[in-house]
From Swiss-Prot:
Protein role: Component of the sulfite reductase complex that catalyzes the 6-electron reduction of sulfite to sulfide. This is one of several activities required for the biosynthesis of L-cysteine from sulfate.
Entry's cofactor comment: Binds 1 siroheme per subunit. Binds 1 [4Fe-4S] cluster per subunit.
Quaternary structure annotation from Swiss-Prot or TrEMBL: Alpha(8)-beta(8). The alpha component is a flavoprotein, the beta component is a hemoprotein.
Reactions catalysed: hydrogen sulfide + 3 NADP(+) + 3 H2O = sulfite + 3 NADPH + 4 H(+)
Protein name per the record: Sulfite reductase [NADPH] hemoprotein beta-component
Pathway the protein takes part in: Sulfur metabolism; hydrogen sulfide biosynthesis; hydrogen sulfide from sulfite (NADPH route): step 1/1
Naturally occurring in which organism (per UniProt): Nitrosococcus oceani (strain ATCC 19707 / BCRC 17464 / JCM 30415 / NCIMB 11848 / C-107)
SUPFAM superfamilies with a match to the protein in the record: Nitrite and sulphite reductase 4Fe-4S domain-like, Nitrite/Sulfite reductase N-terminal domain-like
Signal sequence residues: none
Required co-factors: siroheme; [4Fe-4S] cluster
Protein's gene: cysI
GO molecular function: 4 iron, 4 sulfur cluster binding; heme binding; metal ion binding; NADP binding; sulfite reductase (ferredoxin) activity; sulfite reductase (NADPH) activity
Annotated binding of siroheme, by residue: 483
Family annotation (Pfam families): NIR_SIR, NIR_SIR_ferr
Family: Belongs to the nitrite and sulfite reductase 4Fe-4S domain family.
Length: 579
């Protein structure tokens, strides 16, 4: 592989850990058995990600535990691999039980169309992951330097085309699944065959896997709910009528960056061509292998595919791909996107089956005094004969409901006070957040916990400006890594320090343009005060059909970002103001 040419002395610490891990085994077994601590050793925390779990600690308790001379309150986040976001009712009930037995009595829908469990302590980690597998699901490759959960349009019942695209998400997921037996040995108690390990347990990945995570998503125009341009490999389904004819190939998207390091930036993917369905696996595998072979293994901040492309060129990438394929991609086919949000409420398909998409703020499923959401969805799962579909916007579709079962589900929604989505404002429906504090070790500020209160204040300002019915995308993240895909949101708050956020404006409503830093290190009060006159200006002078993100660019509040490397550029006469 080309990365072998990189000087081994300069390889990142994680690369060295992977190389000696014996295909992700490390000393995880020994660490799980050591109950004298709630943690595992540092090297194994890197390997556990490939198994679908992150070691964390409760940051709300850090200071007090330090004062008491106790180790941090360690726990683990466990993420499910669920291509296309499909969950059957029986699986829902099994995951619900695991969350109540081993986690923090909640489930969280992620921005990659799957579930996360939080606050799983080490002594329950094996039981939790084994339980997920007993539900015929898995956690392998939900995290780590591999292909992550493959996302696609959330409802395959809407048309034959949607069903075909969903099937492709499963095929891609299975094709790039790690082959190591370490997962089954550690979590399901499979005995390792005596003797040495196979010479190569990973025919696609190799012993050091990828330089960084790799994300694949499929979308069907005109909806871009998966934010296809944010994917390492984005696939835009091209159809004639309801028949899939192929995919436009989009490469090099990614959200993460680091504050004050302009060499790191979000990037939207480039559309480089078109392939037929029969060519897709070959194309996808070779794109992943180019990243495997040429991705930066010395600096993890430069290790995503977006930097591999920008450090050489998109023309180099296309030439390398065509050379490996032995043939050229066809020219990309025309397409058009209208939005990157979900379509809420009841929808009836051509076969008379019903589908209901619910709005779930931040994807959090838990019981509160005002709304026993987790209990209500559990009761629905007990009678539901269809399935559940998770969306990449952290919402939930109860899918494939028969005409006779629809009234029963409606009755349960009312009984457990689960509101219909039309009760929520458009800006709330288009809002997302990451988890952030107290569990995420990278968070610099609140996100999920601050969003409800902030949204209420923002809704009042929007309503005062006469924009209560205007859809505007809002995303909040506790750090610049961008798990809620903030840099393709019309308004984005990115945590800078506790209680302070960088304010970004100007992304495209359909996720087709990056936003730009407008103000730095603002408090919530300052953000509200900053946005209020912009909303009033927008209400007065917007053009017919003009979205807020387009307006702030046209009005000159921020410059249009045409490429990721322009993201940090600031015109001298529009220098970013610090609070």
């Amino acid at each position: 592989m080309t990365h072998d040419l990189q000087q081994k002395s300069k390889l990142s610490a994680v690369e060295k850990i992977k190389a000696k891990s014996r295909y992700l085994r490390g000393t995880i077994q020994e660490g799980l058995a050591d109950l004298a601590t709630g943690a595992v050793v540092e090297e194994d925390t890197k390997l556990l990600k490939f198994h679908g779990t992150y070691q964390q600690d409760d940051r709300d308790l850090r200071t007090e535990r330090m004062r008491q001379k106790l180790e941090p309150a360690y726990s683990f986040m466990v993420r499910v691999r669920m291509p296309g976001g499909v969950c059957m009712p029986k699986q829902w009930l099994q995951l619900d039980e695991l969350a109540r037995k081993y986690a923090n009595n909640s489930l969280r829908i992620t921005t990659r169309q799957t579930f996360q469990f939080h606050s799983v302590v080490k002594r329950h980690l094996r039981s939790t992951i084994a339980g997920i597998n007993e539900a015929l699901l898995s956690t392998i490759a939900a995290c780590g330097d591999v292909n992550r959960n493959v996302v696609c349009h959330n409802n395959p019942y809407l048309s034959p085309l949607h069903k075909t695209v969903y099937e492709w998400s499963k095929r891609l997921s299975n094709h790039f699944l790690p082959q190591t037996q370490a997962y089954h040995e550690i979590w399901m108690g499979k005995e390792k065959v005596a003797g040495t390990l196979p010479e190569n347990e990973e025919p696609i990945y190799g012993e050091t896997y990828l330089p960084r995570k790799f994300k694949i998503g499929i979308t069907i125009p005109p909806n871009n709910e998966i934010d296809v341009f944010s994917q390492d490999l984005g696939l835009i389904a091209i159809a004639k009528g309801s028949r899939l004819v192929g995919f436009n190939i989009c490469v090099g998207g990614g959200m993460g960056m680091t504050h004050s390091e302009p060499s790191t930036y979000p990037r939207l993917g480039d559309v480089i061509g078109f392939c037929t369905p029969s060519q897709l696996l070959e194309v996808a595998e070779n794109i992943l292998k180019i990243q495997r072979d040429f991705g930066n293994r010395c600096d993890r901040k430069q290790a995503r595919l977006k930097y591999t492309i920008d450090s050489r060129s998109i023309d180099w990438f296309k030439a390398e791909l065509n050379q490996r394929l032995g043939w050229d991609l066809e020219p990309a086919r025309p397409f058009h996107f209208e939005s990157n949000g979900d379509h809420f409420g009841w929808v009836e398909d051509s076969k008379g089956r019903w589908h209901l998409t619910l709005f779930l703020l931040s994807g959090r499923i838990k019981d509160t005094l005002d709304q026993p959401l987790m209990t209500g969805l559990r009761e629905i799962a007990k009678i539901h004969k269809g399935d559940f579909r998770l969306t990449t916007n952290q919402n939930l579709t109860i899918a494939n409901i028969s005409k006779t079962n629809k009234p029963r589900i409606e009755a349960l929604l009312e009984k457990y006070r689960i509101p219909m989505p039309e009760r929520f404002s458009p800006i709330r429906q288009h809002a997302m957040s990451c988890v952030a504090l107290p569990s995420c070790g990278l968070a610099m500020a609140e996100s999920e916990r601050m969003l409800p209160g902030f949204l209420a204040r923002l809704e009042a300002v929007v309503e005062k400006a006469g924009l209560a019915d205007e859809p505007i995308t809002l995303r909040v993240t506790g750090c610049p890594n961008g798990c809620s895909r903030p840099y393709i949101s019309e308004i984005a708050l990115v945590g800078k320090s506790l209680g302070r956020y960088n304010l970004y404006l100007g992304a495209g409503f359909a996720g087709q343009r990056l936003n730009k830093l407008y103000r730095e290190s603002l408090t919530e009060d300052e953000i509200i005060a900053t946005l209020s006159p912009l909303f009033e200006h927008y209400a007065r002078e917007r053009q017919q059909g003009e979205h807020f993100g387009d307006f702030v660019v046209r009005a000159g509040y921020v410059d249009e970002v045409r490429a990721g490397r322009e993201f940090h550029e600031v015109r001298s006469e529009k220098a970013v103001q610090s609070a």
